[in-house]
Amino acid sequence: MKIVAEYSGEYQDMINSYYNLEQYDDNSTSEVLFQGYSTSINNELKEKYKDFKKRVYINLEAPCAYTSTQTCNDEQTYFTDVYTICPYSAKWLNETTNTKFVPIPFPFSKKCFENINYNAPKEYDVMYMGHLMCAEHLAIIDIMKNYKYIHSSLSPFREPYMPTHVNINSGVKWDLLSKTKVSIAMNLAPLNPGHPESIMGYDGWEKNEAFKNMGSGYMPQFKPRVIESMMCKTLVLVKYDDWNVIENWFEPNKHFIYWYSIEDLFYKLYHIVNNYKSYNHIVEAAFEKVQDYEITNIYNKILNNESL
């Protein structure tokens, strides 16, 4: 398969920065894989490969891209196959286009984690990775402050919510994560006031389940931090929501644990931190399961036209 990768306009030190799919480029003249959002909107590239029988795109931006452009669906239908982290957009577009959409979790490269010392002691109790974008995020930090915690973010925030670590490289983040008992996650993207208008500009938008409850102020977005945590053997506490997108690939109480409210998070975090060894079977099961989604395995599925 011919590999076309372009990362301009994207965060450079993220888990998807290290797929190195170029290593699989065999200069095929009939099959091509595009990686990187900029490739999906590059008309020059699309013209160059338009006659290839199989044209694949790895979509890691859905459904968030619908909030900022009116051309998402047009961009996708150029491809014969799209592998996307949004199962709801995949279902919607499978019903309305000739492109085959296949849901996948966020892929990772195992090379990113080859220096992790899995025998190192857990020096920290809990970690949250990401920006603080809503009141619930602030409440999470308030709870974490009762423990030896880490908050890693790409940018600073006002006091008293200044992250403990700002704009650290991914290698440092993964090392810290591997030394932490619990990772807190929300597979949700907060909606800004202008986002619903952009989304509703798409014909049939209401048939995409990702947009079924915009009144909640959120839409589903599967987070790479879930994958990173599982690879670092850190127990994942995930917010239960209207979608629970994680259940497309992982099982609750087998690979992760739900929290249902801030109060529930308060009590569950206390119990886990103080009884961590009793949750080790979940950590190990998640580590084993997540191997299925390593980028080489995903690529082989793409080659063989297989679903996950």
What does each model-found stretch correspond to?
Residues 256-262, 272-276:
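Conserved acidic donor-binding segment of nucleotide-sugar-dependent glycosyltransferases
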Residues 1-24, 28-30, 34-47, 51, ...:
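Nucleotide-sugar donor-binding catalytic core of glycosyltransferases
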Residues 229, 256, 286:
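Hydrophobic, well-ordered secondary-structure elements that form the walls
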Residues 274-307:
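A charged, aromatic-enriched C-terminal amphipathic alpha-helix characteristic of glycosyltransferases
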Residues 188, 236, 254-260, 301-308:
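Short, contiguous hydrophobic alpha-helices characteristic of membrane insertion segments
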